[in-house]
Amino acid sequence: ISCTGSKQCYDPCKKKTGCPNAKCMNKSCXCYGC
C-alpha cells in the first residue's frame, strides 16, 4: 500500500490484516499491533 502519511495506512491495515496500528515507511504502509 503506497502512502505519503501514516493516516492513509490505518484503514487499509485494518481491512487487510486487522491490525490497529500502522506507519508509513519508505512510502509504503507497515501494519503492526496485530
Curated annotation (Swiss-Prot):
Domain of life, source organism: Eukaryota
Post-translational modification: Contains 4 disulfide bonds.
Pfam family of the protein (one): Toxin_2
SUPFAM superfamilies: Scorpion toxin-like
Cysteine pairs bridged by disulfides in the record: 3-24, 9-29, 13-31, 19-34
Record has Transmembrane as a keyword: no
UniProt tissue specificity: Expressed by the venom gland.
Residues bearing the modification Cysteine amide: 34
InterPro entries according to UniProt: Scorpion_toxin-like_sf (IPR036574), Scorpion_toxinS_K_inh (IPR001947)
One of the record's GO cellular component terms: extracellular region
Stated family: Belongs to the short scorpion toxin superfamily. Potassium channel inhibitor family. Alpha-KTx 06 subfamily.
Function: Binds to voltage-gated potassium channels Kv1.3/KCNA3 (IC(50)=0.48 uM) and Kv1.1/KCNA1 (IC(50)=6.7 uM) and inhibits channel activity.
Name by which UniProt lists this protein: Potassium channel toxin alpha-KTx 6 hetlaxin
Organism this protein belongs to: Heterometrus laoticus (Thai giant scorpion)
